[in-house]
Amino acid sequence: MSDANNTAGDANEVNPEKDLSAENLPGQRGQGGEEIRVQRGMFGANNGGDTSGYGGLVRSVRLPGPASRPYGGWFDEVADELEGALEEQGLLPDNAIEKTVVDRGELTFHIEREHLVRVARTLRDDPALRFELCTGVSGVHYPHDKGRELHAVYHLRSITHNRLIRLEVSAPDGDPHIPSLVSVYPTNDWHERETYDFFGIVFDDHPALTRIMMPDDWQGFPQRKDYPLGGIPVEYKGAQIPAPDQRRSYS
């Protein structure tokens, strides 16, 4: 009976290497972090004939702020090893890492763009880190995040240590350049082309940065939030389907 109780007790103990439930709880939106805009009305639209009352909604739009030590679980181990490895290369961690975010049980390093390649190579090659795989890059457009409107988010996986982190890099609309990581993670080739195609982020030193989804002569970048609703007519089974901005309105 005693052994059974001990076994049950062991099973119920929290394993800090695997259980980050406290950080994994959804944070309360609008509390803490960095406010980038105030959204009014439902879905940000407040000039319609709303009679529901939702047009009066006011919501603070925030990005997660920097976390404080200890981060929890293995996050501190990764952060310590990364900072130590950068120092060994003569690079001060504070000059390379803009901030470290722990949000919803996930670890994200915000990196100064000029140091992105060195940080990524360190994460890949250091034996205690060994993030061998980058599963892709995602683009994000925050028009109200002044001076850093364009974000590129890299998702790194350590197969050796079974860990997942992110690197996030920002650039202003007026200078949308971020170093390419194809030299470190060759599988990013098409992902960076797609992010360029849809968001207009220019990945410097990419071997062939051309559009991958849209026609070569397409104007603009369709997934940016300032991209106008529009398009071109499409022929389908002999019928012409008008572009979205030319279709009949039923409202």
Curated annotation (Swiss-Prot):
Region of interest (Disordered), ranges: 1-34
Catalytic reaction(s) noted: a quinone + NADH + 5 H(+)(in) = a quinol + NAD(+) + 4 H(+)(out)
An example Gene Ontology molecular-function term: quinone binding
Stored InterPro entries: NADH_DH_suC, NADH_quin_OxRdtase_su_C/D-like, NADH_UbQ_OxRdtase_30kDa_su
Presence of the UniProt keyword Signal in the record: no
Family matches, as Pfam families: Complex1_30kDa (PF00329)
Enzyme class: translocase
Keyword terms of this UniProt record: Cell membrane, Membrane, NAD, Quinone, Translocase, Transport
Membrane topology, as annotated: Peripheral membrane protein
Any single Gene Ontology cellular-component annotation: plasma membrane
UniProt keyword annotation of Cell membrane present: yes
Compartments, record wording: Cell membrane
Record-listed E.C. numbers: 7.1.1.-
Subunit note: NDH-1 is composed of 14 different subunits. Subunits NuoB, C, D, E, F, and G constitute the peripheral sector of the complex.
Function comment: NDH-1 shuttles electrons from NADH, via FMN and iron-sulfur (Fe-S) centers, to quinones in the respiratory chain. The immediate electron acceptor for the enzyme in this species is believed to be a menaquinone. Couples the redox reaction to proton translocation (for every two electrons transferred, four hydrogen ions are translocated across the cytoplasmic membrane), and thus conserves the redox energy in a proton gradient.
PANTHER family (alphabetical): NADH DEHYDROGENASE [UBIQUINONE] IRON-SULFUR PROTEIN 3, MITOCHONDRIAL, NADH DEHYDROGENASE UBIQUINONE IRON-SULFUR PROTEIN 3
Family indicated by similarity: Belongs to the complex I 30 kDa subunit family.
Protein name stated in the entry: NADH-quinone oxidoreductase subunit C
The organism of origin for this protein: Streptomyces coelicolor (strain ATCC BAA-471 / A3(2) / M145)
Gene: nuoC
